Amino acid sequence: MENETVSELNQTQLQPRAVVALEYQVVTILLVLIICGLGIVGNIMVVLVVMRTKHMRTPTNCYLVSLAVADLMVLVAAGLPNITDSIYGSWVYGYVGCLCITYLQYLGINASSCSITAFTIERYIAICHPIKAQFLCTFSRAKKIIIFVWAFTSLYCMLWFFLLDLNISTYKDAIVISCGYKISRNYYSPIYLMDFGVFYVVPMILATVLYGFIARILFLNPIPSDPKENSKTWKNDSTHQNTNLNVNTSNRCFNSTVSSRKQVTKMLAVVVILFALLWMPYRTLVVVNSFLSSPFQENWFLLFCRICIYLNSAINPVIYNLMSQKFRAAFRKLCNCKQKPTEKPANYSVALNYSVIKESDHFSTELDDITVTDTYLSATKVSFDDTCLASEVSFSQS
């Protein structure tokens, strides 16, 4: 059957080659260059800021790095060959390129879906089951899960090595080489449908259910008590601080923790929603074409589907920058755009030694550093009666 199919695909065609409109080529090249270029830079920055910034190395960010690598793979393996196809009108990467590039395309697509599923489950456990999260949602476990995700998708996508071949079509005015299938559509359509179910329908249903539970906990009910909330209380080892200040600070800290978790959940939910929406045109087209005798292949609609896929892979760094204060600060620092403080440094300093425990959550990505330093310093006034070095230092609270 395979030999018959190859001979049918490679048969000489004496009709003139269909010419793609110039405006279609220009629009394709410009859009793909802009979206893929920005997406590649943005996803590289995500990987760098998490790898180089210690406080950014959290389980959730570990999954976001996996997602960024998968998106990079999609942008490079799917976006850039689209440009050469538009310029030359033929496949220019040879047989090995056909196998490897297609493999990397599907590897990136499926790994991104699995990464989204992984951080959705991690968020659900961290927020809805905080006691279990103490040993389930750890950085080391996140790395193991990511290794499993990439190993599974790498093995699964090897299926495409056995389905692809170069197809040569001879026209009156040219010979066109394309990277396509060496089996008929009746055989590879079920594979598309399986991909649609495993890497789109199931993750989206799971995300809808889990984010429903998360929303109920965060926005409708009080957040479950974290066992660390009871063990990590503010230590009052100095008589310089009164009890009311400690209580108020602890309340502010708890409220900040809840607010941070809500913001992180919103950010990740936006990532999932955009994934569902931007992949919907292509996935729908694949399902519809599986039941049509002649597949629908209108050029402009196919371009729209591709652009949606590239946008999905390029937009996540923008979401992180808009919705995460930590990512925004890390991006600024990476670009050396951090503004210098406008205040002049003090001529001399006074050490204020307070024993403060920082409230943190090792299994979640917090957007704001939770600290009470500013609260304590605002309650402690430091005045300098003279500008000379022998000036007297007085505190309003003794």
Curated annotation (Swiss-Prot):
Alphabetical list of SMART domains matching this protein: 7TM_GPCR_Srsx
Name by which UniProt lists this protein: Thyrotropin-releasing hormone receptor
Disease note: Hypothyroidism, congenital, non-goitrous, 7: A form of central hypothyroidism, a disorder characterized by sub-optimal thyroid hormone secretion, due to insufficient stimulation by thyrotropin of an otherwise normal thyroid gland. It may be caused by congenital or acquired disorders of the pituitary gland or hypothalamus. CHNG7 is a congenital, autosomal recessive form characterized by normal-to-low T4 and normal-to-high thyrotropin levels, and reduced or absent pituitary responsiveness to thyrotropin-releasing hormone.
Upper taxonomic lineage: Eukaryota, Metazoa, Chordata, Craniata, Vertebrata
Localisation per UniProt entry: Cell membrane
GO cellular component: plasma membrane
Organism expressing this protein natively: Homo sapiens
Family, similarity comment: Belongs to the G-protein coupled receptor 1 family.
Segments in the Cytoplasmic topological domain: 52-61, 122-144, 216-266, 320-398
Transmembrane segments: 29-51, 62-83, 100-121, 145-168, 194-215, 267-288, 297-319
Lipid bilayer topology: Multi-pass membrane protein
Disulfide-bonded cysteines: 98-179
Keywords, ordered alphabetically: Cell membrane, Congenital hypothyroidism, Disease variant, Disulfide bond, G-protein coupled receptor, Glycoprotein, Membrane, Receptor, Transducer, Transmembrane, Transmembrane helix
